Amino acid sequence: MQKIRKGDKVVVLSGKDKGCSGEVIKVNPKENKAFVRGVNMVKRHQRQTQKQEAGIVSKEAPIHLSNLAIADPKDGKPTRVGFRMNVDGNKVRFAKRSGELING
């Protein structure tokens, strides 16, 4: 089970976007990287196709998972993630800062 998943709210811990938060769009577990909406934006030159015209497009670049932390559901501050068994016997994630369950 992964600590950071698609749809999670995360906070960037280091780099040019330190302190910024956003939603995880995509996670690549083999490379230990994730794409976060609106964070780590880079400009790419787009070649013209039949569907879209040429130009410079801003898109998200991947961020290493070690530079991300889950935002605590209670106050939005970065927290570590723990795992515990639910009453149903399912493994669930929880915020170590507040003890709140992380949905997903």
From Swiss-Prot:
It holds the Pfam family ribosomal_L24. Coiled coil: none annotated. Transmembrane segments: none annotated. GO terms for cellular component: ribonucleoprotein complex; ribosome. GO terms for molecular function: rRNA binding; structural constituent of ribosome. Keywords: Ribonucleoprotein, Ribosomal protein, RNA-binding, rRNA-binding. It comes from the Bacteria. SUPFAM superfamilies: Translation proteins SH3-like domain. GO terms for biological process: translation. Part of the 50S ribosomal subunit. One of two assembly initiator proteins, it binds directly to the 5'-end of the 23S rRNA, where it nucleates assembly of the 50S subunit. One of the proteins that surrounds the polypeptide exit tunnel on the outside of the subunit. Belongs to the universal ribosomal protein uL24 family. This is Large ribosomal subunit protein uL24. It comes from Bartonella quintana (strain Toulouse) (Rochalimaea quintana).
